[in-house]
UniProtKB/Swiss-Prot annotation:
Record key words, sorted: Chromosome, DNA-binding, Nucleus, RNA-binding, Telomere
Record bears the keyword Oxidoreductase: no
CDD domains with a match to the protein in the record: hPOT1_OB1_like
Summary of the function given for this chain in its UniProt record: Negatively regulates telomerase activity and participates in chromosome end protection. Binds RNA non-specifically. Associates with a regulatory Pol III-dependent lncRNA, which represses telomerase activity in response to DNA damage. Binds single-stranded telomeric DNA with weak affinity.
MF terms in GO: RNA binding; single-stranded telomeric DNA binding
Family of the protein in this entry: Belongs to the telombin family.
Organism: Arabidopsis thaliana
Gene3D superfamilies assigned: Nucleic acid-binding proteins
Any GO BP annotation: telomere capping
Protein's name in the database: Protection of telomeres protein 1b
Expression (tissue specificity): Expressed at low levels in roots, rosette leaves, cauline leaves, stems and flowers.
A Pfam family hit: OB_POT1A
Amino acid sequence: MEEERRDDYKFLRIQDAFKALHLHVNLIGVIVELGFSNGSDCSCTLKIVDPWYSGSGLPVKFVARTIRDLPRVESIGDIILLSRVKIVLINRKITALCNETTSSSFALFNGKHSVDSIPYQSSPKFLMREQDKNFLSNLREWMITYKFEDGSCCFTSLKDIKEGECSNLSCQIVHISKVYKDRWYLFVWDGTEMPPCNILVKSERLPLCVEPEMLPTYMLRKFPTFGSVLRIIVDRVSEKQAIHCLQPGQHVKLLNLFFQVNMGLWNATFTPSTKMQYTMSREMEAFSPQRMCGEKFSPRWNPIARCISRSHSEITGVAHDDAPFVSLMDILTYHNVTAKFRCVVRFIQVYPRDVRKLRDINGNIKLVAILEDATARIHASLYADEGEKFFGCDESDEEALVKKLNRLLGGEEMEKVPRNPPWVQCCLFSFYKHKMDQWESRRFRIFDTWINAS
């Protein structure tokens, strides 16, 4: 009798679940959207679809005694089996409620690239049946040709983001870094350049990156060398538990990210409504740098010229007009310690700012600049004869020096007055200070560059 009752057990199609308000049902579906757990009440949400309902998905809310008991989805596109979940209305939306404190249970299985019928996570009350394996197999086969379409979501490129607003982002995970025990950073990229920021800081030295320290060269070599890499700050417990399913190289859709600017650098944070959404394999393939920008080679300078198309002002001139433009990320990740480069950058800050302090005790110009493009920031020095060439005016003519610096920096450094430094061309060479530790002591210096007369 027990066997007969179990054989009659069936999953409800998701399209029929929308008509089963207040009933307890059994469901199986593909996870197409993942929300973050609410640390205060131990709950989280996701959306599922099946072959008979592939719209935006059925919301499923999980409630547990502890965060540890909530589903820990390894990848968007995995399969979930739900037993005795109740169809309810939450915020006027039909939702399947899986409450651990009642008779509900769930099990998580790997998605279309697996043949395993053993769940990688299941709740204590879950009981696997032999016929469930057929449902798993059929869903995985269906996913091979499945195309998820959620017409309610519009995605914004990084080039179009706005400070203080929330947007949806379709991007590639470049790197995931744990900086402190309480903070992680997601590094994401979509092949476009984030808008340059106005500079508001007057006296405080600007950082080179959002994270506390720049990543080492061997890690940066895994980054794309064109387009901007956005840092997403992750510091809430619930957020950190959700991002464990992300891996470098994955293409992911993030809904409702909050974008902000600090010290002239873009970053983003999760909001209570941030979710991760399913991405098709063909969409992931489109995020290949080689497909987006072909490599060009220069026999004379560095064989790394990319599709650098940033136009520059005529404020500066260089002695090497035939050299290809490269990005600052190209420079940071170049395979030789010493080399020469030509780039288009913004001078966002210089030290010392007071022209009366530009010279050292020997009378040589000595200046450190923070240079920026869409890919990175670096420190670059200007020294001695190259400094004389750069400014091209008498050392006693302080007014001319101030005027040239202001043109380069996009205005005077005044409290609460934003500057918008212009894009200028610049030649750099890299060198090392310590022969026994060349990469760690690698530095950059400006050369064969000058500020044109206004």
